[in-house]
């Protein structure tokens, strides 16, 4: 096995008692069973060859090879809210993870910013919407209630079908499902999309875009995305979106301004 913890990408070490634990969240790994004690998650074994008195392990570090598109394309990227961006080009238009109204996590999270006027029209004018995973601040039922049910939705094809099942229950059936590192490509218009899996056991994903000579990675909140096997040079990386989304301290009225400042 490798030393990467499948929970959050931490490092597995052997402590003084001989237990294999993660340095981040103390998950304990049982190498005899190949599972973690914290959850019923099985760790994949490494590919190896036994050569005389040693083992040779296959640790592929191949990076994703983006198409060598060179045309300077027109592209506009607009921040809508939280993890939602609106990407507009002459050839296509899409939005990511739209949470643009209401609350999430049973009123535990609220939007930090006011969504721009006309966001409903923005969403419905898209060619498709990308949704990374099923957390309610990414797959947000109230926001999606404003979207035409025929809208194509791009999702990762998780083995659990978590995104597919949730969207189907909301009335969305025009789903574009991409497996890990599967691509959509149009060589003539120099358009490339690929959905990447998070590097842990959870259902989460990111989106890789190449449009002409412009490239972007929408990491969203995926942990250890594609095991960090990513293109070396990107025009833009979109991540670290969630600051300030919680209700504390901005929604609390029973604490003074000094206490709110300390809370932040």
Regions found by a protein language model. Name each.
Residues 1-63, 140:
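Rieske [2Fe-2S] iron-sulfur-binding domain
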Residues 1-14, 91-130, 141-146, 224-232:
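Pre-active-site segment of Zn-dependent metallo-hydrolases
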Residues 3, 25-27, 83, 98-100, ...:
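Active-site metal-binding loops of divalent metal-dependent hydrolases
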Residues 29-30, 102-103, 134-139, 161-163, ...:
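Active-site environment of divalent metal-dependent phosphoester hydrolases
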Residues 34-38, 140-150, 165:
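Metal-dependent catalytic neighborhoods of phosphoester/phosphodiester hydrolases
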Residues 40-73, 155-213:
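Metallo-beta-lactamase
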Residues 155, 227-264:
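Cap/insert and terminal regions of metallo-dependent hydrolase folds
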